[in-house]
Amino acid sequence: HINHTLFFKTFLTRLFALYFDYSHTKLRWSDVGMYFQKTSAFDPKDKNNILNTGLIHQDGNFPLVGLVYLTKDACKDSGTSIMLPNKKYKHRPELADEKVRLHKIPQEKLTKKDLEDRKKLILSLNENFEESIRFNNKFNRLITYTGTDFHKCNSFYSGQDERLTLVFFVGKMKSNSQTPLQRLKNQLIQGK
């Protein structure tokens, strides 16, 4: 049995210790969502089937987003990639609408046409982006990024029945200090 409140607070306290020195920093956070996410391969027999690829997306205007991989002995290729728009990139609202439509349909209820539409959507999205950073799926590995970073699951095929992750979204952080990236940007601006 898990004490959800204690787990939630302990996890966040340890997470923020990676960014802030508590002996010199006052920190408050709010609007945090956290949940366990189980996903299954669209094609459990073919690891390389493009349908097993996640859709490139953003999570919203969150200063900190991330996940912890929780599938033991998972296929390392079932990790996550941070994506950057390439020269072909242009905002296409119809792709966002199609993502929403397909996401609302439970995986087991997708028709052959829905799967073909998903394949076309994956290909359309992929041609507008290039991979910037690749994280392999390793049990208990934590990755973080911002909600505005484009990213995708590289494969829902984990080599197991399901791909289990702990996903979190931090809506607000207030501190008398800066995150490491903020400090770096300020030093670059000041020329130090």
Language model features by range: what are they?
Residues 1-44:
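Non-heme Fe(II)-dependent double-stranded beta-helix
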Residues 44-150, 154-189:
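Catalytic core of non-heme Fe(II) oxygenases with the double-stranded beta-helix
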